[in-house]
C-alpha cells in the first residue's frame, strides 16, 4: 500500500516515476547505508557522466518500450531493472499512467523505466559496494515478488477503483513490507535517480530486455492475480459490507445468543477442546477464512501477513482461537459469517461480562487458576479477541501493518477513507480477513502461541511454544511465517502474538492480541467479546469510529492502538469498555478497563513489578492505555501468575525480543505499541517501559513514524534490564533490600527513558532513571547481600535436608561430604579439617558462631573517625593540588568519583548529617566529625549511606519530597543534574554543584553554593541552609584551624556566591529561593572558605596529599559526592567549594582555588558509582534530610523570615540581604561552632592525620 500510495502521489505530481526511481536508489541506499549509497551515487554519477548520452538514448528506448508496452510493459520495463525499485517505479509509473493522460503516462512510464534502470543500476552498484549479496538476493527475491506484487499493485491501482486502490495498496503492502519501506525510502532521491540514471541506463540496457520480458510475464500474471485479488477484494469488500451490516444485526442477535456465544467467548474453557479443534482446523487451514475468493498464491501468506502483519496475524491468531467459536474458524475471514460469529462471540463475551458474569468469573478464575496455560485461558483470550474484536481488529488490521505500511495504509486510508471509509473498511476487513485466513494459519500456527497459547487450535505451534522461552524465542515468535520473520518484528503481530504467546497463556496472547486488535482497531470491537452490547453500539461506533479512527488512527492509530491494546488486552470488562472506539474513549476505556480489571493493577502480573501492575510508569495518555493494556492483561495477570515464573526466567531475555519486536512492531503504529504492550504484559516491567516509551513516542505523534530502533533497541532494552537488576537478566526481580521496589520502578522508568529517549516518559523516566540508576547501584549491592542472605537462609532452612552425619536439620551452611551427601557445616568442616567424620558426641544443639565485634563499635568509630579525618586531610591536600581545576575536574570527578570513595565522601557527610540534625549545631558539629568519621565509615560500608550522600541533592529533594523533591531533582538536574544523563551531561558547575551538594550532605557549604546555583526550589535552599549550617559546622570543625583563611575565602566566596545566588535566584525565579540561596551562600561561602582553608591545611600534609591526591583527585573530584571523612568531606568541600567558587566565580577561583589545585582530573568512571550510590544515598539523605529539614526549616523559618522581611524587589538585593544576613548568622554560628568544634576538629584532624595518617592512608587507598 505504501508503494502504491507513494507512487500514486508521485504520479499525481507527475514526477512520481522519477521520484520513485530516485526512491529506488534511496531504498538501495537505505539498504546499503549512507556510505554505500554515497559510493553507489559516485559510481552512478561517473557512469552517468559517461553514459548521459547512452542514458538519453536508453531513456528514449525505454520510453518507446514503455509507451509501446503499455502500463504492463512499463511495469515490465521497470521490472526489467531487476530490482524491486524498478517494480516500484513501474508501479508508480502505472499509477502515473492511471492518473495522467496517455502521453504523460508514457512519458512517466519511460521516465519510470529509466529511473527503474537507474535504480536497479544504483541498487546493483550499492549492492556491489555494500557487498550485500544477501540483501541483493533478498531484494531479488523480493524484486520478483515485489515486482509482481508491485506490478499487481500498480495494475490494481490502474484497474481498481478507489477501493481497488486500497486493495492495491494492500497488495503493495503484501508485496513486501520491506519493499514498501523501500518505496518510502525510494521516493526521496530524484537527484540520486538522475545520478544513477547512467548506471540505470546501463543496467536497463543489460537487464531491460530480459527483465521486461520476465516482468511483462510476471506483470501479466500479477495483473491477472491482482485483478483476481481485486475482484476478490471487491467481493470480499461487498461481503464485508454485507457482513458488517449483517454483523450489526447479528450483534443484536449475538446479544441474544450471548449465552450460546459466551461459551465461545468465555466458556471456551469448557469448549476449549472444541475451540482448540476449531482453532487447529483454522490453523491447519490457512484460508480458514477461505470465503474470500482471494487467491493465496497471488498473495503469499507472507504478503497477506505483511498486508495485515500485526493486527491480522494477531487477529488471525485469535481467529484461530476464534475459529473455535467463530464456527468456520476465522469466520471473520469468512466475512459476514465470521462477523456474525465474532458478533456472537462478542455478544457471548458481553453476555458473559454482563449477564453471564459467572461464566466470565469462572473463566477468569479458571484462567487465573490455570495460569493462562490451559485451553480455558486461551479460550478466555479467545473471548478477548472475540469475533467482534476480530472484526474490529480486522478493520484496524490495516493499521496492524508494519508501521510504515500502516502509516501508508493509513494515509491511503485517509485518502480512500474519506471516499471509501466504510467500503474500504469493509474491504480491509475482507482483505485482512483473507490475509487473516492465511495469516490465521501462519500466525495461527505461530500465533497459536499468541492467540492460543493455551488453545490447541493454535496448539500445534502453541504446544511447542507452550514454554515462554519457546514462545518468546525469536524463531517461534517470528515463526508465524518464515517469510514474515523480518517483517514479523515490524508487524505488531509478532510482538503481540509472540509476546502474548510468551505469556504462555493464550490468555495473555489473546488478550495482547485482542488488545492489539483493539489497539489496532481501538474503536472497533476490542470490547466486543466482553461487551456485546458495547459491540453492537461499537460496531456502529466501529464503523463510525473506524472511519474516524481510520482517520484518527492514522493520526492516533498508534496511540489508540496502545489504548485499545491496553483495554483489549484485558480479557473482560477492560476490553469491553475499551471497545469504545473513540481515542478518548479508548483512553477512558483503558482507565475503565484498568478499573474494571481491578486486578489489573492489583494483579500486576503477580510479579509485583510496577511495570506489570499498571504497565508501570507507562506514562500518561496512550501510555496509560498501554499500561492498562498490560493490565487489562493484568486482568489476566493473575492468570499469568505462573507467568511470573516465566517472567523471571524469560522476562529479561524476552524483553529484548519484545523490544526488538516492539521496535519493529512500533513501526507499526499500534503494532509496535501493541507489541510493546504485549511485551509489557509479558515482561511486566521492561516491555512496559519500552512499550511506554514507544507509546509515549506514539503519543508524541512519532507513532506514525515510530522507528522501531528509535525507542526500543535490543541493546537499549538490555541496558535498561541490566540497569534494572544490576545486569542480572534472569533476576529481573532484583533483590533490592532497601530500594528494590523503587529501584525496579525507577529502573522501569530508566528503561523507559533509555528505551525511548524522545518519549514523553523520558522526562519522568530520566528522574526515575536517575533514582533508578542510583537505586540500581544500591540494588546491585543489595542484590548481592540479599542473594547471599537468601542463600544462607535457604541453606540453613533447606527443607528436608538433614546432616548425613549428625542428622541435624539446622545449620548455618550445608556442605557435602566426599560421598556427596549433605552434611551440616560443623560436620563438613570437621571432616575437611580432620578427614574424619565428626563424632556424634560433638553434636551441639546450638550453632557455634564466631563472636564478631558489632559494627559501629567505639573502636571502629575511632578508626573510622581517624580514617575519615585522615581521608579528609589527605583529600584536602589533594584537593589543594586538585581543586584548582576542580571546577572542571569535579565535573568529571563527580562523575568519576570512585564508588568506594564516593561512599566514603558522600556517606560520611551524610552520616554526619544524620547526626547533625539530631544534635545541636555545635554538638552536631562536634559530633559531626565523629559522626562523619563514624557514620562515614558506616556509610562507606553501608550502600545506603553511600547512596545517601551521592544523592544528597536527591536527599534534599527527598527531604522536601513533596514538591521540592521534584523541584530539587529538576534543580539538581538543571544545576546538579541528578539524573544519570543530566549528571553526565552536567556542566562542570552543575557537576560540581551536584557533587558539592552530595558532599554537602556531609558538608553542605559547597553544596550550598551549588544549591545557591541550583536553588531552584526553596526546599533545596532550605536544605542548603541546613547543609550550610552543617557545613559551616563541618567546615568550622575542619577549617577552624584555617578559620582566618576560611573567613577570607568566605568573603570572596560570599561575594561571588551572592552574585551567583542572585543569578541563581533569578534563574530559580523564586525570591524566597534567591533569599534562601543568599542565606545559603554565606554558609556555602563559609563552607567553601572553610573547605578551602581545610584544603590549605590539608595541603600541609603532603603525604596524605600524595596518597590521597589520586584518591582525592577522585575523591575531591568526587568530593562533592565522595568526601571520605569529615576531613575528607571538608577537603572535598574545600575543593568543591573551591571548584564551585572556581567554576562559579573565576575571580575567586584564583583566590579560593589557590588552596585547591587538582593535580589530575578524576576519571569519568566515578559517574556510575555516583549514580550507583544515589539510591542508598537517597535513603540516607532522606533520613538525614528529614532531620536536616527540621533544622533547615527552623533556620529557614528564621532566615526566611529575615529574608522575607529584608526582601526587596531586586533579586540581587534579596540575595545580598539574604546572603549578608545568612552570612552573618552563619559566621556567628561558624564562629561559635568553630570555637566549640575547632578544638575537637583540630584534635580530630591532628589525631586522625597524625597517628592515623599512615594507617588511614592505607585505609583510604584501600577504600579507594
From Swiss-Prot:
Phosphoserine modified-residue sites: 1208, 1210
Any GO CC annotation of this UniProt entry: nucleus
Residue ranges with Polar residues bias: 189-198, 1008-1023
Keyword terms: Activator, Developmental protein, DNA-binding, Metal-binding, Nucleus, Phosphoprotein, Transcription, Transcription regulation, Zinc, Zinc-finger
Protein name as annotated: Box A-binding factor
UniProt entry tagged with the keyword Transferase: no
Record note on domains: The GATA-type Zn-finger domain is required for binding DNA and interacting with Bfc. Isoform 2 differs from isoform 1 in that it has an additional zinc finger domain. It is unknown if both zinc fingers are required for DNA binding or interaction with Bfc.
Zinc finger intervals, GATA-type: 803-827
Record GO terms (molecular function): DNA binding; DNA-binding transcription activator activity, RNA polymerase II-specific; DNA-binding transcription factor activity; DNA-binding transcription factor activity, RNA polymerase II-specific; RNA polymerase II cis-regulatory region sequence-specific DNA binding; sequence-specific DNA binding; transcription cis-regulatory region binding; transcription coactivator binding
Complex and partners: Interacts (via GATA-type Zn-finger domain) with Bfc; this interaction enhances srp binding to the promoter of crq/croquemort.
Cell compartment(s), UniProt: Nucleus
Low complexity bias (residue ranges): 161-171, 422-438, 447-459, 523-554, 565-585, 599-614, 909-950, 985-1007, 1024-1048, 1185-1200
Comp. bias intervals (Basic and acidic residues): 1-11
Amino acid at each position: 500500500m505504501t508503494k502504491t500510495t507513494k507512487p500514486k502521489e508521485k504520479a499525481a505530481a507527475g514526477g512520481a516515476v522519477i521520484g520513485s526511481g530516485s526512491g529506488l536508489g534511496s531504498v538501495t541506499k537505505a539498504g546499503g547505508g549512507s556510505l554505500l549509497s554515497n559510493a553507489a551515487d559516485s559510481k552512478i554519477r561517473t557512469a552517468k557522466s559517461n553514459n548521459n548520452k547512452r542514458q538519453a538514448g536508453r531513456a528514449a528506448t525505454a520510453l518507446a518500450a514503455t509507451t509501446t508496452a503499455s502500463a504492463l510493459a512499463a511495469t515490465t520495463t521497470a521490472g526489467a531493472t531487476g530490482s524491486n525499485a524498478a517494480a516500484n517505479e513501474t508501479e508508480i509509473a502505472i499509477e502515473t499512467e492511471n492518473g495522467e493522460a496517455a502521453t504523460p503516462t508514457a512519458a512517466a512510464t519511460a521516465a519510470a523505466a529509466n529511473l527503474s534502470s537507474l535504480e536497479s543500476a544504483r541498487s546493483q552498484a550499492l549492492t556491489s559496494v555494500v557487498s550485500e549479496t544477501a540483501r541483493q538476493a533478498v531484494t531479488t527475491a523480493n524484486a520478483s515478488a515485489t515486482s509482481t506484487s508491485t506490478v499487481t499493485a500498480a495494475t490494481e491501482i490502474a484497474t481498481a477503483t478507489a477501493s481497488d486502490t486500497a486493495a492495491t495498496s494492500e497488495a503493495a503492502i503484501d508485496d513486501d513490507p520491506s519493499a514498501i519501506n523501500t518505496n518510502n525510502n525510494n521516493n526521496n532521491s530524484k537527484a540520486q535517480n538522475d545520478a544513477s540514471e547512467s548506471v540505470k541506463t546501463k543496467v536497463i540496457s543489460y537487464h531491460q530486455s530480459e527483465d521486461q520480458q520476465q516482468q511483462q510475464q510476471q506483470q501479466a500474471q500479477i495483473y491477472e492475480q491482482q485483478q483476481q485479488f481485486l475482484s476478490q477484494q471487491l467481493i470480499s469488500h461487498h461481503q464485508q459490507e454485507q457482513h458488517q451490516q449483517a454483523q450489526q444485526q447479528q450483534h443484536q442477535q449475538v446479544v441474544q445468543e450471548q449465552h450460546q456465544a459466551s461459551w465461545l467467548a468465555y466458556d471456551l474453557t469448557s469448549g476449549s477442546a472444541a475451540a482448540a479443534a476449531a482453532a487447529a482446523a483454522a490453523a491447519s487451514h490457512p484460508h480458514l477464512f477461505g470465503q474470500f475468493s482471494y487467491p493465496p498464491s497471488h498473495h503469499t501468506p507472507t504478503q497477506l501477513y505483511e498486508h495485515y502483519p500485526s493486527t491480522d496475524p494477531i487477529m488471525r491468531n485469535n481467529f484461530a482461537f476464534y475459529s473455535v467459536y467463530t464456527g468456520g474458524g476465522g469466520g471473520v475471514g469468512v466475512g459476514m459469517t465470521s462477523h456474525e460469529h465474532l458478533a456472537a462471540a462478542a455478544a457471548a463475551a458481553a453476555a458473559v461480562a454482563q449477564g453471564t458474569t459467572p461464566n466470565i468469573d469462572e473463566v477468569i478464575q479458571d484462567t487465573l487458576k490455570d495460569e493462562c496455560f490451559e485451553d480455558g485461558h486461551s479460550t478466555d483470550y479467545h473471548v478477548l479477541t472475540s469475533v467482534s474484536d476480530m472484526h474490529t481488529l480486522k478493520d484496524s488490521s490495516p493499521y496492524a501493518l508494519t508501521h510504515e505500511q500502516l502509516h501508508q495504509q493509513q494515509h491511503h486510508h485517509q485518502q480512500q477513507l474519506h471516499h471509501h471509509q466504510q467500503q474500504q473498511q469493509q474491504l480491509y476487513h475482507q482483505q485482512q480477513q483473507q490475509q487473516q485466513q492465511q495469516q490465521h494459519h501462519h500466525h495461527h500456527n505461530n500465533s497459536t502461541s499468541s492467540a492460543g497459547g493455551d488453545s490447541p487450535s493454535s496448539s500445534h505451534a502453541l504446544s511447542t511454544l507452550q514454554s515462554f522461552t519457546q514462545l518468546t524465542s525469536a524463531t517461534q515468535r517470528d515463526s508465524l511465517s518464515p517469510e514474515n520473520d523480518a517483517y514479523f518484528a515490524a508487524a505488531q503481530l509478532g510482538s503481540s502474538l509472540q509476546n502474548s504467546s510468551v505469556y504462555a497463556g493464550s490468555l495473555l496472547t489473546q488478550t495482547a492480541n485482542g488488545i492489539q486488535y483493539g489497539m489496532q482497531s481501538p474503536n472497533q470491537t476490542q470490547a466486543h467479546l466482553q461487551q456485546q452490547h458495547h459491540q453492537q453500539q461499537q460496531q456502529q461506533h466501529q464503523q463510525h469510529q473506524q472511519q474516524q479512527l481510520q482517520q484518527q488512527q492514522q493520526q492516533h492509530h498508534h496511540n489508540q492502538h496502545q489504548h485499545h491494546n491496553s483495554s483489549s488486552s484485558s480479557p473482560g470488562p477492560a476490553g469491553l469498555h475499551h471497545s469504545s472506539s473513540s481515542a478518548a474513549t479508548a483512553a477512558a476505556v483503558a482507565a475503565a478497563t484498568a478499573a474494571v480489571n481491578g486486578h489489573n493493577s492489583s494483579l500486576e502480573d503477580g510479579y509485583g513489578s510496577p511495570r506489570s501492575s499498571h504497565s508501570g510508569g507507562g506514562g500518561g495518555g496512550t501510555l496509560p492505555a498501554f499500561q492498562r493494556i498490560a493490565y487489562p492483561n493484568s486482568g489476566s495477570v493473575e492468570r499469568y501468575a505462573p507467568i511470573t515464573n516465566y517472567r523471571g526466567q524469560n522476562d529479561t531475555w524476552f524483553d529484548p525480543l519484545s523490544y526488538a519486536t516492539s521496535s519493529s512492531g512500533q513501526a507499526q503504529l499500534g503494532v509496535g505499541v501493541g507489541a510493546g504492550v504485549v511485551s509489557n504484559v509479558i515482561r511486566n516491567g521492561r516491555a512496559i517501559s519500552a512499550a511506554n516509551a514507544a507509546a509515549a513516542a506514539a503519543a508524541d505523534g512519532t507513532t506514525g513514524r515510530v522507528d522501531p530502533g528509535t525507542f526500543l533497541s535490543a541493546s537499549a532494552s538490555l541496558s535498561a534490564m541490566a540497569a534494572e537488576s544490576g545486569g542480572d537478566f534472569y533476576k529481573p526481580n532484583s533483590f533490592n533490600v532497601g530500594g528494590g521496589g523503587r529501584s525496579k520502578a525507577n529502573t522501569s522508568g530508566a528503561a523507559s527513558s533509555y528505551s525511548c529517549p524522545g518519549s514523553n516518559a523520558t522526562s519522568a523516566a530520566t528522574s526515575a532513571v536517575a533514582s533508578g540508576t542510583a537505586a540500581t547501584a544500591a540494588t546491585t549491592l543489595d542484590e548481592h547481600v540479599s542473594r547471599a542472605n537468601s542463600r544462607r537462609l535457604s541453606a540453613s532452612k533447606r527443607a528436608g535436608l538433614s546432616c548425613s552425619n549428625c542428622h541435624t536439620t539446622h545449620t548455618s551452611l550445608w556442605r557435602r561430604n566426599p560421598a556427596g551427601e549433605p552434611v551440616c557445616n560443623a560436620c563438613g568442616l570437621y571432616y575437611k579439617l580432620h578427614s574424619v567424620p565428626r563424632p556424634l558426641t560433638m553434636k551441639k544443639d546450638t550453632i557455634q558462631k564466631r563472636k564478631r565485634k558489632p559494627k559501629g563499635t567505639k573502636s571502629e568509630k575511632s578508626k573510622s573517625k581517624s580514617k575519615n579525618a585522615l581521608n579528609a586531610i589527605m583529600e584536602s591536600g589533594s584537593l589543594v593540588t586538585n581543586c584548582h581545576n576542580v571546577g572542571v575536574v569535579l565535573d568529571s570527578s563527580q562523575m568519576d568519583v570512585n564508588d568506594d570513595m564516593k561512599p566514603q565522601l558522600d556517606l560520611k557527610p551524610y552520616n554526619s548529617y544524620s547526626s547533625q540534625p539530631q544534635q545541636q549545631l555545635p554538638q552536631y558539629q562536634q559530633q559531626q566529625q565523629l559522626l562523619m568519621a563514624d557514620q562515614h565509615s558506616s556509610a562507606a560500608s553501608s550502600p545506603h549511606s553511600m547512596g545517601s550522600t551521592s544523592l544528597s541533592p536527591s536527599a534534599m529533594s527527598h527531604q522536601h519530597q513533596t514538591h521540592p523533591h521534584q523541584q530539587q531533582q529538576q534543580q539538581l538536574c538543571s544545576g546538579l543534574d541528578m539524573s544519570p544523563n543530566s549528571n553526565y551531561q552536567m556542566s562542570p558547575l552543575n557537576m560540581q554543584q551536584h557533587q558539592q551538594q552530595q558532599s554537602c550532605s556531609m558538608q553542605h557549604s559547597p553544596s550550598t553554593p551549588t544549591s545557591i546555583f541550583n536553588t531552584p526550589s526553596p526546599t533545596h535552599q532550605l536544605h542548603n541552609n541546613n547543609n550550610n549550617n552543617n557545613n559551616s559546622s563541618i567546615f568550622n570543625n575542619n577549617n577552624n584551624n584555617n578559620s582566618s583563611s576560611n573567613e577570607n575565602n568566605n568573603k570572596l566566596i560570599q561575594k561571588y556566591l551572592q552574585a551567583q545566588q542572585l543569578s541563581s535566584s533569578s534563574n530559580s525565579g523564586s525570591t524566597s529561593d534567591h533569599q534562601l540561596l543568599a542565606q545559603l551562600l554565606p554558609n556555602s561561602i563559609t563552607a567553601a572558605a572553610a573547605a578551602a582553608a581545610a584544603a590549605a591545611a590539608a595541603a600541609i600534609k603532603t603525604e596524605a596529599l600524595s596518597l590521597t591526591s589520586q584518591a582525592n583527585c577522585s575523591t575531591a573530584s568526587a568530593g562533592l559526592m565522595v568526601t571520605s571523612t569529615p576531613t575528607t568531606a571538608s577537603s572535598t568541600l574545600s575543593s568543591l567549594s573551591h571548584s564551585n567558587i572556581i567554576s562559579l566565580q573565576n575571580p575567586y577561583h584564583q583566590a579560593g582555588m589557590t588552596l585547591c589545585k587538582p593535580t589530575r582530573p578524576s576519571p569519568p568512571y566515578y559517574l556510575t558509582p555516583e549514580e550507583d550510590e544515589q539510591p542508598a544515598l537517597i535513603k540516607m539523605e532522606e533520613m538525614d534530610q528529614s532531620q536536616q529539614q527540621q533544622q533547615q526549616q527552623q533556620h529557614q523559618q528564621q532566615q526566611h523570615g529575615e529574608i522575607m522581611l529584608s526582601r526587596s524587589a531586586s533579586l540581587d538585593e534579596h540575595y545580598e540581604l539574604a546572603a549578608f544576613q545568612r552570612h552573618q548568622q552563619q559566621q556567628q554560628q561558624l564562629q561559635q561552632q568553630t570555637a566549640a568544634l575547632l578544638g575537637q576538629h583540630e584534635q580530630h584532624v591532628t589525631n586522625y592525620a597524625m597517628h592515623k595518617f599512615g594507617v588511614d592512608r592505607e585505609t583510604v587507598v584501600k577504600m579507594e
